[in-house]
């Protein structure tokens, strides 16, 4: 609810939302919002060998909403576009970019759990207000980005972090800029497998992507139970928590967008049935946590993460050494 309201307030006009076998009431909430004309909701069931996220991305590329769009943002519901430009609208951001921009690499900003143990029915952006600093190059997750792309750019498929590009020999390279509107180097534009901004410009003075991948310890247990939509082989475990639980600095920059978000959120809650469905979903999460935390494996994980302190930002020198050792360790 908050995620939709936030991006509606920022100027997103159309939402194409894929849900994946939800049992927490999310599907019913999305159906109610779709019936009211707020979003398009497409429940999906996994078919074939692709991950369910890639299945959705390939389907979305063929959807009429994608075909009529001017700009496109692929985003998970734990990612909030944080626009720093005065006005805090996507239209304000676009005006601040070079005219020939095809894509914006929006750097992730990892937000920690802010020492919040139990889930609350309160805005994510108001609860979790501590993050990694802008300069944070380790672990690799701190250097990832999401892409705001011009629909008419030289692309032929959506991607989790960046779109697939048409052959450069036929369409040329897309004009990429960072979150400050500065042109990205050609090596970045040419290598569409590059998903990290490590050692590359990662400006964020115009916009960035707040990533609330942990939230409370309670919510994290439910995330562990569900798994990731694109990498079922990746464990949601203590390592995942430590690599993302940065509470290094107070970061409330997104609060400038909250008044407009709250207006939209109130409007969404006035849609018949939505508030009741939301309340049921909140109760489901609390009940699910209680069922999980009394199981040995989940209890062990919960106990460890509440004992674990915030993650430390490594020095540039140590980060570089770790990268060199990584190259040696995984050299084929």
Positions of PLM-derived features:
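Active-site beta-to-alpha loop of glycosyltransferases that engages the nucleotide-sugar donor
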Residues: 1-6, 21
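Short acidic/polar active-site loop segments enriched in Thr and Asp
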Residues: 13-14, 70, 102
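Active-site-proximal specificity loops/subdomain of glycosyltransferases
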Residues: 25-72, 82-85
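Short beta-strand/loop segment that forms part of the nucleotide-sugar
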Residues: 13-21, 42-46
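Catalytic-site signature of metal-activated, phosphate-bearing donor transferases
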Residues: 83-308, 331
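Charge-dense, extended regions
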Residues: 319-323, 327-331
């Amino acid at each position: 609810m908050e995620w939709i309201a936030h991006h509606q307030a920022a100027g997103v006009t159309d939402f194409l939302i894929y849900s994946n076998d939800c049992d927490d009431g999310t599907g019913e909430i999305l159906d109610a919002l779709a019936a009211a004309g707020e979003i398009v909701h497409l429940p999906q069931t996994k078919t074939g060998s692709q991950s369910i996220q890639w299945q959705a991305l390939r389907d979305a590329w063929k959807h009429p909403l994608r075909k009529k769009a001017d700009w496109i943002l692929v985003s998970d519901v734990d990612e909030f576009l944080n626009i720093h430009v005065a006005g805090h609208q996507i239209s304000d951001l676009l005006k601040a970019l070079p005219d020939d921009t095809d894509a914006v690499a929006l750097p992730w900003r990892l937000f920690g759990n802010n020492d919040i143990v139990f889930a609350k029915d309160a805005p994510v952006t108001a609860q979790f207000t501590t993050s990694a600093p802008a300069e944070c190059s380790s672990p690799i997750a701190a250097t990832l980005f999401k892409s705001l792309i011009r629909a008419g750019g030289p692309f032929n498929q959506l991607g989790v972090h960046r779109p697939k590009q048409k052959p450069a020999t036929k369409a040329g390279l897309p004009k990429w800029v960072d979150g400050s509107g500065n042109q990205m180097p050609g090596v970045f534009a040419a290598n569409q497998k590059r998903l990290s901004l490590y050692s590359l410009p990662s400006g964020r003075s115009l916009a960035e992507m707040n990533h609330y991948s942990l939230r409370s310890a309670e919510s994290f247990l439910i995330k562990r139970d569900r798994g990731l939509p694109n990498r079922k082989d990746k464990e949601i475990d203590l390592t995942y928590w430590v690599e993302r639980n940065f509470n290094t600095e107070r970061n409330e920059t997104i609060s400038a967008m909250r008044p407009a978000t709250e207006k939209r959120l109130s409007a969404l809650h006035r849609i018949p049935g939505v508030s009741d469905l939301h309340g049921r979903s909140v109760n489901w999460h609390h009940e699910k946590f209680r069922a999980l935390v009394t199981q040995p494996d989940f209890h062990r994980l919960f106990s460890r993460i509440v004992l674990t302190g915030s993650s430390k930002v490594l020095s540039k020198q140590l980060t570089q050494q770790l990268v060199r050792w990584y190259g040696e360790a995984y050299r084929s």
